[in-house]
Every structure is written in C-alpha cells, then in structure tokens.
C-alpha cells in the first residue's frame, strides 16, 4: 500500500481527467492540483452554472472541458477519474479504456490507500440506516470512526491522517461498485430488488455491480447477507471469505436471528441474546433487519452493551419515517428516502392503520405491480404527483381487490398541491406519509431536498 504522496508522485507528468465537480470529486481535484499535477475537469454543466466553483479550481491551475461534449476527448488523457453518475459503459469511457487510459474513481483510490479496516454497506434498501448504526456501534466502543461514501463527506482528504487502529464505514451504491477492484474487510448486503434500471438497464447488470462489495475479499474478511431475500441468500454462496447470515423470519443455526422478542447471534463461540427489540426506538420491521445486519457486521469488534446503548438513544436518520409534526390530531411523516417500491412497502408495514400516502416522482423504470397490491390493503387515500403518477395509478387500479378497498386516488401537479390535498383528506387520528416509491429527480435535486421541502410545507400548514 502506497501513501497518497507516493501515488501523486506516480502521476507526475501525466494528463489527468476528472469527470464531474460533485461532492466527492471536488476535494480530489483540489488535492491533485495542490500536488502540482495536470488536471482537466470534465463536466456537463455550462461555465455560467458552475462559475464560482470553476474560478476557484482555475486559480489552482485546473483546465476545463464543459458542456454537452464534456466527455468527447477522454481518450487523450493518461488517467481518468470517473464520477459514479457516469456509467463505465459510456461509449467515451469505453473508448478511453480501449486506448489504454486507466479508469478509476475517488472511492477506488481511497480503498487503495486506506491503512485501516473498512466496513462497507450496499443493497437496494436500508443502506444509510445500517451504515449509521455500524458507525454508532463502533464509536460507542471507543474507535475513531470515519463515515463516508454515499453519506458523510469524501474520505480521501482524511486518508493521510488515518492509522491502522481507526475504522472506516462506507455506504456504497451500485454506481460506485461497478468498477471496484477491492472489497471492504467487512461487507454488508442488506437486500436486493429491482432499482436504478434507468442506469443499469438490466437487473443482471445491477446485481453484477453489487457483487463487487465482497468479490475481492481476502482470508479473514467477512460478508453479511440477508437470508430472507432470495437474491442475497443465493449470492451468499459466492462469498470467498467468512460469511454471516441474518434473518428476521427464520431461526438460523448460525448467524443473527429473532428469538423471544430479541435479536440473537449464534457463532462458533455459542449463542447469545444481543438486543431486546424493546430497546429499538425506530419503527418498522425493516429497521429490525437493519439492526440485525449491523450487529452481524460488528460481531467481534463491539461489545453487546454498546449495541444496547446505541439502540436506546438512536431515533433514526433524517427522511426515514421521520415524524415532522402532529396537527389537529393528524401525524405527518417524512419518508422521502422511499425512492423504490420496496422501500415504500416497508414504510407501509411500519404502521398499524391505513395511511394517507403521498407518492410519485422520477421514473427509474421499476415496476409498481406489487406496490399497487399493498396500497389497496394499507392506504385509504393515495395522493399522486410527479412523472410516475399515471403508472402508479394504473398499478393500483389493476390490483386485485381495488374495487372493494375504498381507496381514493387524487392526482396533483406538485408536492405543495399534494400536501394540501392530503391535509384536506385527513381527519383526527389519520397519518399522512410522504413515501414516493420513486426518485426525486423529476422535480428536485435529490430525495433530501424533496424531504426538506415536504417538511417546510407541513410546518407551514
């Protein structure tokens, strides 16, 4: 393992392209420029949209390739740093690779240089909560913990100060994993269901990307899989190193499971109760699964008393079944992280009454058939907005039992109108939930902005 200084020295005299000026790549660009390396920033935004950021990087020596043709000359560079948002299968990246340019990324470089243990989490749902729980468990046990990937901040600027005794916890998306050539020391696969098919095109490509979280593991490493998910249970047989399963529905001979209203763990040291379910403060059976995954990840690293201490105070992550307020006897919840049908179904399962649900958003090419069935059972009023509103409506109206369900469907033009419609439909005792089952890109920058706007709208009622 080289140091970051040695790595930068190996790039001296080479032409470097960095695709994108996003959250993870901008610190990388600064580091490369401060090492006096030749960097060209390639970004699809026109100069006027990124003027302030571009001016700062230009003052450090950056050159730019901006606008719609920002990828057109990648093949001329000696090294290309990819942004997760651009697929490695993009024709211009393929062309650059064929010409001999190494294609890498900020996260791949971090893995290459990191001196300490890395725990990584991927899956279709539950990544952020599981990542957060793992990091909180480790902090409670006294470790110096760095959190990054899809959450937290870019880790590369901190790598020079890390020591072998530290811990790194990263949330990894399929976009990041596609080209990874190293796996975390502990990898967690929460579950897998159709998602991001607008990017990956097929479920097979999506699954193949996710596999990199454990494919490159070495002896002594561990991979954690969800036994209750058909795909991850099958993938667990491919784990090249240590493996641990968790299951909410089945008692396992070895692994993490439920028994007597508590989470238990059985390994070669025996069986023990780790966490009473009564200690968990966040709602939903899916969050029990998130706890199980995190407990499996830290087994042997964190005493059980630390797990219990975290559970007794942890109230969840923003935008995940987050109570916004109670107004006139009606509770309003923000579950903007519900960016897929499976997430929204998990949200519906977290309540013991029929909901007023606000759903719809950007179309990722994911089917809504099963969600439609669940909505007829668990939703009293469905308020739709966004690009997918017609597709969700169709799935609900074609679901068995829709005619008898009494489910009312309201279509609105935007989130503000949807909140107003939900308030109009609500009576004391009702629960209104934003859980869109879709990404936010049709009307918002991301799910966080959507959740923030929702909370502002609700607090203004």
Name every feature range the model reports, one short phrase each.
Residues 1-105, 109, 303, 394:
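N-terminal leader/targeting and accessory segments in enzymes
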Residues 3-15, 25-35, 275-380:
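Nucleotide phosphate-binding/pyrophosphate-handling subdomain across enzymes
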Residues 22, 45-47, 151, 228-229, ...:
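Residues in the short beta-alpha loop(s) of Rossmann-like NAD(P)-binding domains
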Residues 33-34, 71-77, 84-227, 231-242, ...:
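Phosphate-binding loop of NTP-binding sites
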Residues 38-45, 223-227, 358-359, 378-387:
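Short internal beta-strands
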Residues 39-43, 147, 169, 245, ...:
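Short beta-strand "acidic-cap" motif of Rossmann-like dinucleotide-binding folds
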Residues 43-45, 65-68, 104-108, 240-258, ...:
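Beta-strand->loop->alpha-helix junctions that form or flank phosphate-binding loops
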Residues 53-55, 370-429:
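C-terminal helical cap/extension that packs against the catalytic core
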């Amino acid at each position: 393992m080289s140091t970051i200084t040695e790595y930068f020295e190996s790039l001296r005299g080479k032409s470097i392209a960095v695709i994108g000026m996003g959250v993870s790549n901008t610190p990388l660009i600064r580091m490369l420029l401060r090492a006096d390396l030749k960097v060209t920033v390639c970004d699809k935004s026109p100069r006027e949209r990124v003027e302030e950021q571009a001016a700062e990087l230009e003052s450090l020596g950056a050159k730019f390739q901006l606008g719609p043709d920002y990828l057109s000359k990648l093949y001329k560079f000696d090294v290309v740093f990819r942004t997760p948002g651009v697929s490695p299968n993009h024709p211009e990246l393929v062309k650059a690779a064929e010409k001999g340019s190494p294609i890498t990324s900020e996260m791949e470089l971090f893995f290459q240089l990191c001196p300490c243990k890395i725990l990584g989490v991927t899956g279709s749902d539950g990544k952020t909560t599981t990542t957060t729980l793992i990091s909180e468990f480790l902090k409670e046990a006294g470790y110096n913990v760095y959190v990054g990937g899809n959450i937290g901040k870019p880790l590369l600027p901190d790598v020079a100060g890390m020591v072998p005794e530290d811990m790194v916890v990263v949330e990894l998306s399929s976009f990041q994993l596609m080209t990874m050539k190293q796996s975390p020391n502990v990898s967690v696969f929460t579950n897998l269901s159709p998602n991001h098919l607008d990017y990956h095109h097929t479920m097979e490509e999506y699954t193949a990307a996710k596999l990199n979280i454990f494919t490159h593991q070495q002896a002594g490493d561990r991979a954690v899989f969800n036994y209750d998910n058909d795909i991850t249970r099958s993938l667990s047989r491919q784990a090249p190193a240590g493996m641990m399963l968790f299951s909410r529905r089945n008692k396992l001979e070895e692994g993490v499971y439920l028994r007597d209203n508590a989470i238990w763990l059985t390994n070669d040291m025996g069986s023990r109760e780790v966490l009473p379910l009564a200690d968990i403060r966040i709602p939903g059976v899916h969050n029990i699964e998130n706890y199980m995954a995190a407990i499996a990840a830290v087994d042997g690293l964190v005493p059980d008393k630390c797990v219990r201490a975290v559970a007794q105070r942890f109230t969840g992550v923003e935008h995940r079944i987050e109570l916004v307020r109670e107004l006139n006897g009606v509770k309003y919840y923000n579950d903007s992280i519900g960016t897929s049908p499976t997430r929204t179904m998990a949200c519906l399962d977290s309540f013991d009454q029929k909901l007023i649900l606000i759903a719809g958003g950007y179309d990722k090419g994911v089917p809504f058939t099963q969600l439609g069935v669940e909505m007829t059972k668990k939703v009293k009023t469905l308020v739709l907005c966004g690009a997918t509103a017609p597709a969700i409506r169709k799935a609900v109206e074609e679901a068995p039992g829709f005619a008898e369900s009494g489910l009312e469907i309201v279509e609105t033009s935007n989130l503000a109108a949807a909140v107003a419609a939900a308030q109009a439909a609500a009576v004391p005792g009702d629960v209104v939930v934003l859980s869109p089952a879709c990404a936010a890109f049709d009307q918002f920058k991301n799910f966080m902005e959507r959740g923030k706007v929702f909370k502002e709208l609700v607090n203004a009622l």
